Curated annotation (Swiss-Prot):
Keywords assigned by UniProt, alphabetized: Chloroplast, Membrane, Plastid, Transmembrane, Transmembrane helix
Protein source organism: Porphyra purpurea
Protein name: Uncharacterized tatC-like protein ycf43
Subcellular location per the Swiss-Prot or TrEMBL entry: Plastid, Chloroplast membrane
GO MF term set: proton motive force dependent protein transmembrane transporter activity
GO cellular component: chloroplast membrane; TAT protein transport complex
Chief place where the protein resides: plastid
PROSITE patterns: TATC (PS01218)
Length: 254
């Protein structure tokens, strides 16, 4: 009987054992569910604390969000509009503050079950997604929001006086920040497609004509305002993010 199949089997076992995480302790389904429940409770408590703190500091947060709207007077058009808008803003701030902590809990939950090779891929992607979302929000606040507001304020300023609803303005700002943060996740999606072998970097580069059209559509859909300036800036950012993802995949040889 040939020993070659047995040697191949032993080699595969040794290779797989090297990829397994250290101190891997088996857990029952009940233990997994209990750990998941505990981490979910931790995230929920953290969210409540973050939202509560945000509500107590709502005046400072409102002033920060109002900063891009220079020279605009905000009106309360309905009873309790400011109060209910403050609750909404506090909830959104709580979600944003909780997201990194939630991702951290997800990492702690899935980490013991990952091989060393999977850890090298998944952990940077999770951390990178948080960083890119935050960068997208900062880009929206310092670039997109001022550009959109300046256009909307200056257009027809000699005819009508800009008096804006407090609630509608903050819906506009929050939607702009959130949608831009999502748009900045494009390189993460490209990395997942490239690493999984679904689409290569060369194929992504060859599709540049279609990407220009798609980026224009994304810029029109994700920007809550209809002004061309904001849409052009958003489309340009989407293109830059896309080609950045292609360059990263080329560097990774995917």
């Amino acid at each position: 009987m040939s020993l070659e199949p047995q040697n191949n089997l032993l080699a595969n076992i040794n290779t797989n054992s090297e990829n397994l995480p250290e101190n891997d302790v088996p857990m029952s389904i009940t233990e997994h569910l209990e750990e998941l429940r505990q981490r979910t409770v931790f995230v929920f408590i953290f969210f409540l604390l973050a939202a509560t703190i945000s509500f107590t500091q709502i005046k400072i947060i409102v002033e920060i969000f109002q900063a891009p709207a220079i020279g605009i007077k905000f009106l309360q058009l309905a009873p309790g509009e400011y109060f209910f808008s403050s609750i909404k803003i506090a909830i959104y701030c709580g979600i944003v503050a909780t997201t990194p902590f939630g991702v951290y809990q997800v990492i702690l939950y899935i980490l013991p079950g990952l091989t060393n090779k999977e850890r090298k891929v998944i952990l940077p992607i999770l951390i990178g997604s948080i960083v890119l979302f935050i960068v997208g929000g900062i880009f929206a606040y310092f670039v997109l929001a001022p550009a959109a507001l300046n256009f909307l304020i200056s257009y027809g300023a000699d005819i009508v006086e800009p008096l804006w609803s407090f609630e509608q303005y903050f819906d506009f700002i929050l939607l702009l920040l959130f949608s831009t943060g999502l748009a900045f996740e494009i390189p993460i999606i490209q990395l997942l497609l490239g690493i999984s072998g679904t689409v290569s970097a060369s194929q992504m580069l060859l599709a540049w004509r279609y990407i220009i059209i798609i980026s224009t559509i994304i810029g029109a859909v994700l920007t809550p305002s209809t002004d061309p300036v904001t849409q052009i800036i958003m489309s340009s950012a989407v293109l830059a993010l896309y080609f950045s993802g292609v360059i990263i995949l080329f560097l990774l040889r995917k």
